Every structure is written in C-alpha cells, then in structure tokens.
From Swiss-Prot:
<keyword id="KW-0560">Oxidoreductase</keyword>
<dbReference type="InterPro" id="IPR011057">
    <property type="entry name" value="Mss4-like_sf"/>
</dbReference>
<feature type="binding site">
    <location>
        <position position="104"/>
    </location>
    <ligand>
        <name>Zn(2+)</name>
    </ligand>
</feature>
<keyword id="KW-0862">Zinc</keyword>
<feature type="binding site">
    <location>
        <position position="101"/>
    </location>
    <ligand>
        <name>Zn(2+)</name>
    </ligand>
</feature>
<dbReference type="InterPro" id="IPR028427">
    <property type="entry name" value="Met_Sox_Rdtase_MsrB"/>
</dbReference>
<comment type="similarity">
    <text>Belongs to the MsrB Met sulfoxide reductase family.</text>
</comment>
<feature type="active site" description="Nucleophile">
    <location>
        <position position="124"/>
    </location>
</feature>
<dbReference type="GO" id="GO:0030091">
    <property type="term" value="P:protein repair"/>
</dbReference>
<dbReference type="GO" id="GO:0008270">
    <property type="term" value="F:zinc ion binding"/>
</dbReference>
<dbReference type="GO" id="GO:0033743">
    <property type="term" value="F:peptide-methionine (R)-S-oxide reductase activity"/>
</dbReference>
<keyword id="KW-0479">Metal-binding</keyword>
<dbReference type="GO" id="GO:0006979">
    <property type="term" value="P:response to oxidative stress"/>
</dbReference>
<feature type="binding site">
    <location>
        <position position="52"/>
    </location>
    <ligand>
        <name>Zn(2+)</name>
    </ligand>
</feature>
<protein>
    <recommendedName>
        <fullName>Peptide methionine sulfoxide reductase MsrB</fullName>
        <ecNumber>1.8.4.12</ecNumber>
    </recommendedName>
</protein>
<dbReference type="Pfam" id="PF01641">
    <property type="entry name" value="SelR"/>
</dbReference>
<dbReference type="GO" id="GO:0005737">
    <property type="term" value="C:cytoplasm"/>
</dbReference>
Length: 142
C-alpha cells in the first residue's frame, strides 16, 4: 500500500463515488449545495439524532432543530462531541463559514450568526449530508 497521502486520498475519493449517489457526492465530497426546500430531512420533526451521511459521526440533536425558513434543515447548536469543523468560505463573492464533518471531512453546509437563543447560531445543513436516526429506531437518509 502506498504511503503517499495524496494517492491514498484519491483512492478514498474513488470509494466515495461508489458509496454515494451522484448528488450526495456533489454535496458531501465537492462542497456542493442541494436546492432549497428539496431535502428529505427539512420537515423531519421526530426526536432523534442527525449523523453524518458518510461516517455516521453524531452531529446535531433534534431538539436544536428549528424552522429558519431558508429551505435547509437548521440547528442552533451542534452536539457537545464537537464533530463539526469550521472553515472560511469566500466563494461566490461572499464571506461565510463552511462546516464539515470533523471525522471524515464531508461537507455539511454553513453556519451563520443569525440563529435563535441561546447560541445565536444557525447551522444551515444539506439534507443530503446527513442521516436522521429516530428514537423510534427508524432511520431516514437525506
């Protein structure tokens, strides 16, 4: 096996192309964004946990989800585990903070400083980047 990190990463990306649908790959691995109001998890209201679609790292508890009216699932707080990583995004002539899964590097969405109390944060997350695991043991993939 190669010890060249770049080569190992490209092999991993090949694997993601097999594991994910074309749209999931675009959102999760190429930092794309799904169209607003199209995500399966936007209207999910049950109690449970939102996890990373790619590695199942726990991301957001359902009790921090709120309707921001923006067209994507929104949360005001990540789990205390800290599986969300932050990077500056200056694409499209804007300055934003992009969020990724800290465990596998999967793109999640963006965080904005216009959310509700108690944090004032709005984690705006693509449904395609998450799986919902309900307390009723029903799983919904975004």
């Amino acid at each position: 096996m190669s010890t060249d990190k770049k080569q190992d990463e490209s092999i991993a990306e090949k694997d993601w192309k097999v594991e994910l649908s074309e749209q999931e790959y675009y959102v999760c691995r190429e930092a794309g964004t799904e169209r607003p109001f199209t995500g399966v998890l936007l209207d999910e209201q049950r109690d449970g946990l939102y996890v990373c679609k790619c590695c199942e790292a726990p991301l957001f508890p359902s009790d921090t989800k709120f309707d921001a009216g923006c067209g994507w699932p929104s949360f005001y707080k990540q789990l205390d585990d800290g599986n969300v990583d932050y990077r500056e995004d200056v694409s499209h002539g804007m300055r934003r903070v992009e969020i990724f899964c800290k465990q596998c590097g999967s793109h999640l969405g963006h965080v904005f400083p216009d959310g509700p109390a108690p944090t004032g944060q709005r984690y705006c997350v693509n449904s395609l980047s998450m799986t919902f695991k309900g307390e009723d043991n029903v799983e919904v993939k975004g």
